[in-house]
Amino acid sequence: MAASATFYRLLSRCGKAARSRPLGARCFGVRVSPTGEKITHTGQVYDDKDYRRIRFVDRQKEVNENFAIDLIAEQPVSEVQTRVIACDGGGGALGHPKVYINLDKETKTGTCGYCGLQFRQHPH
């Protein structure tokens, strides 16, 4: 019983609070390690005796609380009419190189490899 509870806590981002939330709800806030240090989007956290903690002796570790992967996951799947869609990430200087995504595969949704946006062909 205790092992399954620990496993469930490790899988969920927010620990015990995740059980009471609906599946689509987002956990606001930053994950914190047992030492009280904020965990970055890459999972970077240092032990108490790690020499790399010297960077944060007189300063607080600044972590952006809006992880990009979480923000992209909140975007709804876009319904399109064509079977091939071109994604350029919004275009202009803020976009990425144009990629063409084939939507008639078995997965039924196509994901852009650059920005993570998802597309689905609208059935006619």
UniProtKB/Swiss-Prot annotation:
A Pfam family per the record: zf-CHCC
GO cellular component: mitochondrial inner membrane; respiratory chain complex I
InterPro entries: NDUFS6 (IPR016668), Znf_CHCC (IPR019401)
UniProt membrane topology term: Peripheral membrane protein
Transit sequence range: 1-28
Assigned keywords, A-Z: Acetylation, Electron transport, Membrane, Mitochondrion, Mitochondrion inner membrane, Respiratory chain, Transit peptide, Transport
A single BP term in Gene Ontology: mitochondrial electron transport, NADH to ubiquinone
4Fe-4S is among the record's keywords: no
Subcellular location, principal: mitochondrion
Modified residues (N6-acetyllysine): K98
Location of this chain's protein in the cell: Mitochondrion inner membrane
Family listed: Belongs to the complex I NDUFS6 subunit family.
Cited function: Accessory subunit of the mitochondrial membrane respiratory chain NADH dehydrogenase (Complex I), that is believed not to be involved in catalysis. Complex I functions in the transfer of electrons from NADH to the respiratory chain. The immediate electron acceptor for the enzyme is believed to be ubiquinone.
Summary of subunit composition and partner proteins: Mammalian complex I is composed of 45 different subunits. This is a component of the iron-sulfur (IP) fragment of the enzyme.
Name of the protein: NADH dehydrogenase [ubiquinone] iron-sulfur protein 6, mitochondrial
The species this protein was found in: Macaca fascicularis (Crab-eating macaque)
GN (gene name): NDUFS6
